[in-house]
Amino acid sequence: MKQKREIWIDNVKVIACILVILGHFFQSMLKAQIVPGNRIYLWFNQSIYSFHVPLFFICSGYLYQKFSRIDSMSKWVRNIWKKLLVLGIPYFVFSSVQWLLKTMFSNTLNVEMDGFLQVLFAEPLSPYWYLYCLYFIFLITPTFNSGRSAVFISGTALILKLLKINGVYSNIYIIDVVMSNEIWFAMGMCLYAINITGFSQKKAARNLGCVSFIVFLIASMIHIPDTLFWEEGKAFYTGIWACAAVILLVAYSFRNSEQDTGFWGFFAKYTMPLFLMHTLFGATVRTLLLKAGTDSIAIHILIGIPVSFIGPVLLAEIMRRYRLDFFLYPGKYIFKK
């Protein structure tokens, strides 16, 4: 029997994607010295970076536990091969394109690029590091098949995170990034195991979501350091409240929805293209405006933000028409039923 689609998952990813796009846009504006790094900007950047990508990991963990059963070597091998194609093809394609563009326009963008192989295999670019990290999380994480396995996997993920918070590093990128993010993936698996969708039918979910949001706001404003990001401990503790607020409020709001429509339906359809291509369009617009001698904050925002959203959507439609959306959704073509 086909399982009912859970609309709230799509819409949580929509929120995460929008915040990722805005975060990258304004961060690149700061690096190009177009916007000042004042307290308001620092608070915004620190706050959203504590939870926007964690939301993606939580959604991935939830869907992994819901649709997969990795309890044998043969299933593990099949899953890893599938994830290598589904995540690896867009990762390598769009990482290569971004590396090429940033290398060509490094002087204008005020960035210094690492070597091509270094970027692909050792220190991925944003936002593609998420796909890179997610693959390795799939590589090491079995699904829960009992309460004991749930405790073991979640406990291990928490220990890894606490070690990282307390300064235990390997100085190997992939190990450190998995240590940071395995916990969010495990949280997503736990949410499915405890039936968060069922809980979202109750008003208690809405109330808890509101409380979580208030706690997040208070925690985020207690101390705003002169850095782009909080230290890992504060980002984790604050991010938990933000993720809880988003998930509970979105799940409650869409508890009776069977399909996305309007704003949510549109963005849910294009989450992957937006995630993969927003930096390409944003960087291109910023480069052209700077080359034209325009450093007005208003002009960069009024042109750059719409193009960061509209550009990927239009290109995704063109790619779909010529079946080039294979590079966005390789699984749609490789694993046809």
Where are these regions (language model features)?
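Membrane-cytosol interface segments of multi-pass membrane proteins
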Residues: 1-159, 292-337
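Juxtamembrane "helix-exit" motif on the non-cytosolic side of transmembrane helices
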Residues: 29-34, 103-108, 163-171, 219-229, ...
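Structural signal for the C-terminal ends of transmembrane alpha-helices
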Residues: 64-72, 142-147, 187-199, 222, ...
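Hydrophobic alpha-helical segments of polytopic membrane proteins
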Residues: 143, 148-155, 188, 194-217
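Alpha-helical transmembrane segments and terminal signal-anchor/GPI-anchor hydrophobic tails
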Residues: 198-266, 270, 280-283, 288, ...
